[in-house]
Amino acid sequence: MPSPRIRKMSLSRALDKYLKTVSVHKKGHQQEFYRSNVIKRYPIALRNMDEITTVDIATYRDVRLAEINPRTGKPITGNTVRLELALLSSLFNIARVEWGTCRTNPVELVRKPKVSSGRDRRLTSSEERRLSRYFREKNLMLYVIFHLALETAMRQGEILALRWEHIDLRHGVAHLPETKNGHSRDVPLSRRARNFLQMMPVNLHGNVFDYTASGFKNAWRIATQRLRIEDLHFHDLRHEAISRFFELGSLNVMEIAAISGHRSMNMLKRYTHLRAWQLVSKLDARRRQTQKVAAWFVPYPAHITTIDEENGQKAHRIEIGDFDNLHVTATTKEEAVHRASEVLLRTLAIAAQKGERVPSPGALPVNDPDYIMICPLNPGSTPL
């Protein structure tokens, strides 16, 4: 019995058909749309499907892995190429069985790039302040989305899909009827999260946010470019939020998994790149309680400058950059350090009393005499 006749169809046309008839029914449709557009930029997209061989697929793989991402200036990651090959493999399987445009799947036998260990990008306190200020001034909706991500660890798609009828502000719960892993989830809303949501016009029904996935992606890209923040993805905020949950020390792994929606503990491990200084208090059980309190009152780097006052005298100004508007001025350096220590101590104590999160100490520039460490508990030990 002769083989069925192959219908000629270019890979580019097949990708378009796949997006319209198959991908459109998937949760990751938007991501597959982006990947499809990438693939169509390469010569392989002009070939008919039945002419594409394993060599062509391997060549595409190697070309992609050798390229530099123009946004980040870094090589295209193996995970990115794996996802593109997964799209092609799914396309060939559908086309082979249902469309008759090829007899084999050339992607199946090609080696896939190794899975990376995952991103461990953390949001710095400076980046958090700058983004928060930028969004607050430019767009209230972006401001709320940004802080909601840090408070809840929700994915971008979950936040953009929030509806008022699924949010219980009184009891502090946001219901997600459909998530990435196909299961519903109830997300606890902290007091800060509820306060941010209440900044939006509250309705009984409808979407909380008006952004589409592509619209928000563009807004995020513009913000990070204007603020010159490099290699920060919105999904990194989820990683940051989950890491902060671990750093609180009051939630166990199962509770954090219930909040984040992770159904695999192995997946959750990659989100736990905890800052070492916040784990010190657990190393000595005998001093655990003491160190738990002391962890709030750690030294912070500060910039010290000499300024001219209106009376013509010199003065010393100290600014602790990890906090907004935290600075002091005094006639002597010793007095300025002492005042800065007192102000820092008061700021940290108020935050501890209210249970508010404080920024982590930034890095101290190496061999820069204009930077010193301000100790809130012992100003006399602060190096001048």
From Swiss-Prot:
<dbReference type="InterPro" id="IPR011010">
    <property type="entry name" value="DNA_brk_join_enz"/>
</dbReference>
<feature type="active site" description="O-(3'-phospho-DNA)-tyrosine intermediate">
    <location>
        <position position="271"/>
    </location>
</feature>
<dbReference type="InterPro" id="IPR044068">
    <property type="entry name" value="CB"/>
</dbReference>
<dbReference type="InterPro" id="IPR010998">
    <property type="entry name" value="Integrase_recombinase_N"/>
</dbReference>
<dbReference type="GO" id="GO:0006310">
    <property type="term" value="P:DNA recombination"/>
</dbReference>
<keyword id="KW-0233">DNA recombination</keyword>
<feature type="active site">
    <location>
        <position position="180"/>
    </location>
</feature>
<dbReference type="GO" id="GO:0015074">
    <property type="term" value="P:DNA integration"/>
</dbReference>
<keyword id="KW-0238">DNA-binding</keyword>
<feature type="active site">
    <location>
        <position position="262"/>
    </location>
</feature>
<dbReference type="InterPro" id="IPR050090">
    <property type="entry name" value="Tyrosine_recombinase_XerCD"/>
</dbReference>
<comment type="similarity">
    <text>Belongs to the 'phage' integrase family.</text>
</comment>
<protein>
    <recommendedName>
        <fullName>Shufflon-specific DNA recombinase</fullName>
    </recommendedName>
</protein>
<feature type="domain" description="Tyr recombinase">
    <location>
        <begin position="118"/>
        <end position="284"/>
    </location>
</feature>
<comment type="function">
    <text>Shufflon-specific DNA recombinase.</text>
</comment>
<dbReference type="InterPro" id="IPR013762">
    <property type="entry name" value="Integrase-like_cat_sf"/>
</dbReference>
<keyword id="KW-0614">Plasmid</keyword>
<dbReference type="InterPro" id="IPR002104">
    <property type="entry name" value="Integrase_catalytic"/>
</dbReference>
<feature type="domain" description="Core-binding (CB)">
    <location>
        <begin position="9"/>
        <end position="96"/>
    </location>
</feature>
<feature type="active site">
    <location>
        <position position="238"/>
    </location>
</feature>
<dbReference type="GO" id="GO:0003677">
    <property type="term" value="F:DNA binding"/>
</dbReference>
<dbReference type="Pfam" id="PF00589">
    <property type="entry name" value="Phage_integrase"/>
</dbReference>
<feature type="active site">
    <location>
        <position position="235"/>
    </location>
</feature>
<keyword id="KW-0229">DNA integration</keyword>
<dbReference type="InterPro" id="IPR035069">
    <property type="entry name" value="TTHA1013/TTHA0281-like"/>
</dbReference>
<feature type="active site">
    <location>
        <position position="155"/>
    </location>
</feature>
